[in-house]
Each structure stands twice: as structure tokens, then as C-alpha cells.
UniProtKB/Swiss-Prot annotation:
Family per record: Belongs to the neurotoxin 09 (Tx3-6) family.
Keyword hit for Cytoplasm: no
Name of protein: U12-ctenitoxin-Pn1a
Annotated S-S bridges: C44-C58, C51-C64, C57-C82, C66-C80, C90-C97
Record-annotated membrane-spanning stretches: none
The keyword Ubl conjugation is annotated on this UniProt entry: no
Any one annotated GO CC term: extracellular region
Taxonomic source organism: Phoneutria nigriventer
Lineage: Eukaryota, Metazoa, Ecdysozoa, Arthropoda, Chelicerata
Localisation per UniProt entry: Secreted
GO molecular function: toxin activity
Signal peptide (residue range): 1-28
Amino acid sequence: MKYRIFKMKYTLLFLSVIALVHIFAVEAKDEPESDALVPQERGCLDIGKTCKDDCECCGCGNVCYCPFDWFGGKWQPFGCSCAYGLKYVCAHKQKKCPNV
């Protein structure tokens, strides 16, 4: 008898957790996606986001870093991403980029 009550309690607890997870999943789907900003709509990209130019990265000292930037050009087989730059980057970006 005790085993049956014990089993029933844990079954109800498990079903309650499943129902709670389902409710949060449904609420997440119902939120409008129009409020979400697309990276192109924002003025700049955060650290770690894929970029093509220094001007796309947020902040005065952040740069578009290409770890495998071979031959000095912007040919990057593995892509570039926004990263923290050095102090002189800020002066360079202010000359180059209108949005800094």
C-alpha cells in the first residue's frame, strides 16, 4: 500500500513538471518576433558575432578579428568575429567609421 502511494506521488510530481515545462514552451512561442532586432537593423554587432569589417563591431576599441586572415586580405576561410582590440584601434575606427 505504501509503495502505491509513493509511486503515485512521484507520478504526479513528474506530470506537474512536464506540464510546467510545456506552459513555458508555449508562452515562448507566443511572443512576437517583431521586437527582436536583426543584426543588420542594429548599428553594430556584439563581441563574438560574425563580421566583415571593423565598423560593424560595437564600441570604439572592438575590431573585426580574422584568426586565419591569410595573405593580408579579407579572405577568411573560417570567418571573422568581433573581438576586443588594442588602444590604438579607437583612433583608427574614429577616422574610418562614421558610426563610432
